[in-house]
């Protein structure tokens, strides 16, 4: 029936078909194959670097032509169909409110020379004060100076205005200097 030669040919073809030596493109198992990814040739499917800048120049010139044509046709559109410029106007109005306790005139005399700010603890000459507040704070008003401040010194930076408590504002100038008030326990009359 079968000849040994035919049997030998069929067995050789089966061995060659199942061998790892002959691979089809779809049957490669990559790193799980017997070769275990030891392929030192160029990476298949990777694009090679094209050094020719002539193609890049041509593509760049085509883009410039397209942009120029787009601008030309955009400028030919009616004004109503063109996109508006981005709005530059201020949509929120800022209302300036000065800080409490400060006047607008105070801002004018804060610094004459803005570039120079003295270090802390340094005093400037009288013709160029650090701030007007220094001049105003360290020279007390003569109205606020009382004779009793000699005996009592308030904390630094404070001025003391001695006024009596509410209901105790008495004017001693209106009373006579020789007035004598006496109460007697035995109902005697005073002179």
Swiss-Prot record:
GO cellular component assignments: extracellular region
Signal peptide feature range: 1-17
Molecular-function annotations in GO: neuropeptide hormone activity
Keyword Secreted in annotation: yes
Coiled coil: none
Gene Ontology terms describing biological process: neuropeptide signaling pathway; pheromone biosynthetic process
Pfam hit, one: PBAN
InterPro entries found in the cross-reference section: PBAN, Pyrokinin_CS
Annotated keywords: Amidation, Cleavage on pair of basic residues, Hormone, Neuropeptide, Secreted, Signal
Location relative to the cell: Secreted
PTM sites of type Leucine amide: 44, 100, 120, 156, 166
Prosequence residues removed at maturation: 48-91, 169-191
Tissue expression profile of the protein: Expressed in the subesophageal ganglion.
Main localization, broad class: secreted
Function as written in the Swiss-Prot or TrEMBL entry: A hormone that controls sex pheromone production in females and pheromone responsiveness in male.
Protein family: Belongs to the pyrokinin family.
Protein name per the record: PBAN-type neuropeptides
Biological source species: Spodoptera littoralis (Egyptian cotton leafworm)
């Amino acid at each position: 029936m079968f000849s040994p030669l035919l049997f030998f040919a069929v067995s050789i073809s089966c061995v060659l078909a199942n061998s790892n030596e002959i691979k089809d493109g779809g049957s490669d198992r990559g790193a799980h194959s017997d070769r275990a990814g030891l392929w030192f040739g160029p990476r298949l499917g990777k694009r090679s670097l094209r050094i020719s800048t002539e193609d890049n120049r041509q593509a760049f010139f085509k883009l410039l032509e397209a942009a120029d044509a787009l601008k030309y046709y955009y400028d030919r559109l009616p004004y109503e169909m063109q996109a508006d410029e981005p709005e530059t106007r201020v949509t929120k109005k800022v209302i300036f409110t000065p800080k409490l306790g400060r006047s607008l005139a105070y801002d004018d005399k804060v610094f004459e020379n803005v570039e120079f700010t003295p270090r802390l603890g340094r005093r400037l000459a009288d013709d160029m004060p650090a701030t007007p507040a220094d001049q105003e704070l360290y020279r007390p008003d003569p109205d606020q100076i009382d004779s009793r401040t000699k005996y009592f010194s308030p904390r630094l930076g404070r001025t003391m205005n001695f006024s009596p408590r509410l209901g105790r504002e008495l004017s001693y100038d209106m009373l006579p200097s020789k007035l004598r008030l006496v109460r007697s326990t035995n109902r005697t009359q005073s002179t």
